[in-house]
Amino acid sequence: MAAIFSLFLFFILFIVSLLIILSFIVRPRSVTIPIKFRHVFITGGSSGIGLALAHRAVSEGAKVSILARSTEKLAEAKRSIQLATGVEVATFSADVRDYDAVSKAIDESGPIDVLIVNQGVFIGKELEKQSPEEVKFMIDVNLTGSFNVIKAALPAMKAREGRGPASISLVSSQAGQAGIYGYTAYSASKFGLQGLAQALQQEVISDGIHVTLLFPPDTDTPGFEQELKKRPELTSIIAASSGSMKTNEVAKICFDGIKAGKFTVTCHFIGFLLSIASTGMSPQGSFWLALTEVMFGGLIRLASLVFQWQWYKTIEKWSQRNKKEVNSKLA
């Protein structure tokens, strides 16, 4: 009995010691990002998650600007927000691939306190079937476009004085945490945001700017409906292991994470497991979450291997079935 008590006491002391150490070393510290009376600028804000985030920001008293390519969709988004809240938002039409156009829109909108880089495009195909133009399109919009938006906004965001902590958020995807069949180019464009966010946080933390990386799962947006029709069958089978969520649910979780100044924001348990499995050198502002990563990282790696085993078994069965169907047609 004494041995069991000693082991238990050692475990408790170990956890307490680890918590004390982590409370000193986790960086950057989490802060609360104020929203009321502040300027929130959202790219890809005319539909889907971006529009839902705009609704939330307006409802919490922010001055909101949204940017997208389509003037028609921007007008619809502006009307929907005004009907729901009675507040008028500013709209800007620009292609994020065009740095000059983005820079002009951001300059016209005024100094930004909370920047949400949300634009994204997806063309689901195996790489062999994807054209170089399609690959370039996704990389240019999802990754290069994010660089353009942030670079254009940074000078004024850094020049802010006495306005409290600021935020730059990038909307990635669970495909930016784990590569998925049929998402070759898309995953590459979203994985790139991880490196962008990690390095950017180091560059802007001394200016009081906190970076947040958002990892939504499949979300029932208009774009997702089109994606389901076009993406490979095997992609849908594998992606189903994570499940999907409603747009407003995702927007609430993401917006709460932005306000809490978190670096990594996930939307459900599978996403949380993926965040720990892929955390690498990501900053962690919460010593409680840091403790979870340290204590359970190995077990979560085991869980990720189980997922990989399931995915590869699925690919193997699907491939064998397809070969049989092809052979039967040729016979």
Swiss-Prot record:
<dbReference type="InterPro" id="IPR002347">
    <property type="entry name" value="SDR_fam"/>
</dbReference>
<dbReference type="InterPro" id="IPR036291">
    <property type="entry name" value="NAD(P)-bd_dom_sf"/>
</dbReference>
<keyword id="KW-0547">Nucleotide-binding</keyword>
<feature type="binding site">
    <location>
        <position position="44"/>
    </location>
    <ligand>
        <name>NADPH</name>
    </ligand>
</feature>
<feature type="binding site">
    <location>
        <position position="46"/>
    </location>
    <ligand>
        <name>NADPH</name>
    </ligand>
</feature>
<keyword id="KW-0812">Transmembrane</keyword>
<dbReference type="GO" id="GO:0006666">
    <property type="term" value="P:3-keto-sphinganine metabolic process"/>
</dbReference>
<comment type="pathway">
    <text>Lipid metabolism; sphingolipid metabolism.</text>
</comment>
<feature type="transmembrane region" description="Helical; Name=2">
    <location>
        <begin position="263"/>
        <end position="283"/>
    </location>
</feature>
<feature type="topological domain" description="Cytoplasmic">
    <location>
        <begin position="308"/>
        <end position="331"/>
    </location>
</feature>
<dbReference type="InterPro" id="IPR020904">
    <property type="entry name" value="Sc_DH/Rdtase_CS"/>
</dbReference>
<feature type="binding site">
    <location>
        <position position="69"/>
    </location>
    <ligand>
        <name>NADPH</name>
    </ligand>
</feature>
<dbReference type="Pfam" id="PF00106">
    <property type="entry name" value="adh_short"/>
</dbReference>
<keyword id="KW-0256">Endoplasmic reticulum</keyword>
<dbReference type="GO" id="GO:0070402">
    <property type="term" value="F:NADPH binding"/>
</dbReference>
<dbReference type="GO" id="GO:0030148">
    <property type="term" value="P:sphingolipid biosynthetic process"/>
</dbReference>
<feature type="topological domain" description="Cytoplasmic">
    <location>
        <begin position="29"/>
        <end position="262"/>
    </location>
</feature>
<feature type="binding site">
    <location>
        <position position="95"/>
    </location>
    <ligand>
        <name>NADPH</name>
    </ligand>
</feature>
<feature type="topological domain" description="Lumenal">
    <location>
        <begin position="1"/>
        <end position="7"/>
    </location>
</feature>
<keyword id="KW-0472">Membrane</keyword>
<feature type="transmembrane region" description="Helical; Name=1">
    <location>
        <begin position="8"/>
        <end position="28"/>
    </location>
</feature>
<comment type="similarity">
    <text>Belongs to the short-chain dehydrogenases/reductases (SDR) family.</text>
</comment>
<feature type="topological domain" description="Lumenal">
    <location>
        <begin position="284"/>
        <end position="286"/>
    </location>
</feature>
<feature type="binding site">
    <location>
        <position position="73"/>
    </location>
    <ligand>
        <name>NADPH</name>
    </ligand>
</feature>
<comment type="function">
    <text>Catalyzes the reduction of 3'-oxosphinganine (3-ketodihydrosphingosine/KDS) to sphinganine (dihydrosphingosine/DHS), the second step of de novo sphingolipid biosynthesis. In plants, sphingolipids seems to play a critical role in mineral ion homeostasis, most likely through their involvement in the ion transport functionalities of membrane systems in the root. Is stereospecific for D-erythro-DHS production and does not produce L-threo-DHS.</text>
</comment>
<keyword id="KW-0521">NADP</keyword>
<feature type="binding site">
    <location>
        <position position="47"/>
    </location>
    <ligand>
        <name>NADPH</name>
    </ligand>
</feature>
<feature type="active site" description="Proton acceptor">
    <location>
        <position position="186"/>
    </location>
</feature>
<keyword id="KW-0443">Lipid metabolism</keyword>
<feature type="active site" description="Proton donor">
    <location>
        <position position="172"/>
    </location>
</feature>
<feature type="active site" description="Lowers pKa of active site Tyr">
    <location>
        <position position="190"/>
    </location>
</feature>
<feature type="binding site">
    <location>
        <position position="186"/>
    </location>
    <ligand>
        <name>NADP(+)</name>
    </ligand>
</feature>
<keyword id="KW-1133">Transmembrane helix</keyword>
<keyword id="KW-0560">Oxidoreductase</keyword>
<protein>
    <recommendedName>
        <fullName>3-dehydrosphinganine reductase TSC10B</fullName>
        <ecNumber>1.1.1.102</ecNumber>
    </recommendedName>
</protein>
<feature type="binding site">
    <location>
        <position position="190"/>
    </location>
    <ligand>
        <name>NADP(+)</name>
    </ligand>
</feature>
<feature type="binding site">
    <location>
        <position position="48"/>
    </location>
    <ligand>
        <name>NADPH</name>
    </ligand>
</feature>
<dbReference type="InterPro" id="IPR045022">
    <property type="entry name" value="KDSR-like"/>
</dbReference>
<feature type="transmembrane region" description="Helical; Name=3">
    <location>
        <begin position="287"/>
        <end position="307"/>
    </location>
</feature>
<dbReference type="GO" id="GO:0005789">
    <property type="term" value="C:endoplasmic reticulum membrane"/>
</dbReference>
<keyword id="KW-0746">Sphingolipid metabolism</keyword>
<dbReference type="GO" id="GO:0047560">
    <property type="term" value="F:3-dehydrosphinganine reductase activity"/>
</dbReference>
